[in-house]
Curated annotation (Swiss-Prot):
Residues binding ATP, per UniProt: 8-18
Gene assigned in the entry: queC
UniProt cofactor note: Binds 1 zinc ion per subunit.
Species of provenance: Nitrosospira multiformis (strain ATCC 25196 / NCIMB 11849 / C 71)
Name of the protein in question: 7-cyano-7-deazaguanine synthase
InterPro entries named in the record: QueC (IPR018317), Rossmann-like_a/b/a_fold (IPR014729)
EC number annotated for this UniProt entry: 6.3.4.20
Keywords: ATP-binding, Ligase, Metal-binding, Nucleotide-binding, Queuosine biosynthesis, Zinc
């Protein structure tokens, strides 16, 4: 069986990607990164999802980006925006996060003898992050094939982004067919330690709208004080 490293945050998108990679016949090695995010619920969800979705192994790597700050996701002094998606790069963008995660995944893939890395970036229902675009993935793949022993020796490395051109509704439908239990996932930027979602941050809004558009019941676990209304 061909091995693949799958970046697994614990959220809806990455869980779907793990299910897709498994469905495609890969032996999946799930990789999560503790980068100084506000809560541990996402990583706890990743552990459970790796087990539920049949990953062969799961590693959590520590890289504390909160030392630098620069993002509302890792700096608790900055507020998480709750006014909906706005033009431009949002304050929740974490500088170089995907580049760092993909680099770590690349290192593990080389050790495993794997030529395949999966990541759940999306260019349709995304929040304006520059490292979620097709040209970014293409550029990283080019770099990977120049900068690694495997690439130089002729084993081509591929970065798979199967959600790139899917809407959130399409992602949810795809995951549903593959048996992903979305109640196990945590997408909220400011979830509590139990993984309960705020319902109003950009990530929650996109997720809620996705369930609505897919006409699928929203199984997200919200804070008791959140009154669910149409997201669209």
């Amino acid at each position: 069986m061909v091995k693949a490293v799958v970046l697994l945050s614990g959220g809806l998108d990455s869980a779907t990607v793990l299910a897709i990679a498994r469905q495609q016949g890969y032996e999946c090695y799930a990789l999560s990164v503790s980068y100084g995010q506000r809560h541990g619920a996402e990583l706890a969800a990743a552990k459970n999802l790796a087990r539920s979705l049949g990953a062969t192994a799961h590693k959590i790597i520590q890289v504390d980006l909160s030392t630098f700050g620069g993002s509302a996701l890792i700096d608790k002094e900055r507020e998480i925006p709750t006014d909906g998606v706005t033009p431009g790069i949002p304050s929740t963008y974490v500088p170089a996060r995907n580049t760092i995660m993909l680099s770590i995944a690349l290192a593990w893939a080389e050790v495993l003898g794997s030529g395949d890395i999966f990541i759940g970036v999306n260019a349709i229902d995304y929040s304006g992050y520059p490292d979620c675009r097709p040209e970014y993935i293409e550029a990283f793949e080019t770099m990977a094939n120049v900068a690694t022993k495997a690439g130089i020796e002729g084993t081509r490395l591929a970065i798979h982004a199967p959600l790139m051109n899917l809407s959130k509704a399409e992602i949810i439908k795809r995951g549903g067919v593959l048996g992903v239990d979305y109640s196990m996932t945590v997408s909220c930027y400011q979830a509590d330690d139990a993984g309960l979602a705020c319902g109003v941050c950009d990530s929650c809004r996109l997720r809620r709208a996705g369930f609505e558009s897919a006409d699928v019941p929203d199984v997200t676990r919200y804070h008791a004080g959140f009154r669910q209304t149409p997201a669209s």
